[in-house]
Regions:
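Active-site and adjacent substrate-binding regions of carbohydrate-active enzymes
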Residues: 1-182
C-alpha cells in the first residue's frame, strides 16, 4: 500500500472551488504502481491535512479556505478534523467521504471522522486532533476508566463536537446518523 499524499489536498480544493480539475489533474499525474500494490487514499493523514505536495499558491489557498486561524496550522499543513474542516456540514462531510470511497485506491478513514468528531486547536502540537475516541456520552467518553486528568489528551467537551453530543453509542441508535451512513 502506498499513500497517495498529493490527492488529499486536491479533494479539498475541488470541493471548495466546486471544480473537478484539481482531482483530475493529480490523477493524470499519478504514476502507475505494480499490480500487486494499491494506493491508500485518505482525507487526512493521521493528524493533519498535509500541504507539503502543493504549490505555494495552493497552500495559501488552502490556508485561506480551511485554516484562517494560525492555531489550525502545523508543519506546512492543517491540523483539523474533517467535521470542523467542513464547518460541520453533513452534506459536505458526505460529499468528501463519497469522493474518498469512489476514487481509485483503498480508502483510509481516520478515527472519529466516521462520527463527525471535532478537535481542539488550542492543544499543543498535533494533540488537538489526537483526543480520545468518543465511544459514549458517559465518563471519559467511554474511552478509559482512568481519571480524566490521566488521559493523554483532554476530551472534546464543547456543545457542538463534545462527547455528550457526538459519540458512537448515540449514533449507532440513530438510523440516519453519520456512522450509519458510512
Amino acid at each position: 500500500m502506498a499513500f497517495h499524499f498529493p490527492l488529499m489536498p486536491r479533494m479539498f480544493m475541488a470541493v471548495r472551488r466546486e471544480d473537478r480539475h484539481p482531482i483530475v489533474e493529480i490523477l493524470r499525474q499519478t504514476p502507475d504502481i505494480p499490480d500487486t500494490c494499491q494506493w491508500g487514499i485518505f482525507l487526512r493523514n493521521h493528524d493533519e491535512l498535509t500541504l507539503e505536495m502543493v504549490t505555494d499558491e495552493e497552500r495559501d489557498y488552502m490556508y485561506q479556505a480551511y485554516a484562517t486561524d494560525p492555531q489550525m496550522r502545523i508543519n506546512g499543513g492543517i491540523r483539523r478534523r474533517l467535521a470542523p474542516l467542513m464547518e460541520n456540514s453533513r452534506r459536505r462531510i458526505e460529499l468528501m467521504n463519497s469522493l474518498l470511497f469512489s476514487l481509485p485506491g483503498t480508502p483510509v478513514v481516520y478515527y472519529g471522522d466516521e462520527i463527525g468528531m471535532g478537535d481542539n486547536i488550542y492543544l499543543g502540537d498535533r494533540n488537538g486532533v489526537r483526543t480520545p475516541m468518543q465511544w459514549t456520552g458517559d465518563r471519559n467518553a467511554g474511552f478509559s476508566r482512568a481519571d480524566a486528568a490521566a488521559l493523554y489528551a483532554p476530551l472534546i467537551s464543547d456543545p457542538v463536537y463534545g462527547f455528550t453530543a457526538v459519540n458512537v453509542e448515540a449514533q449507532e441508535r440513530a438510523p440516519f446518523s453519520l456512522v450509519n451512513w458510512m
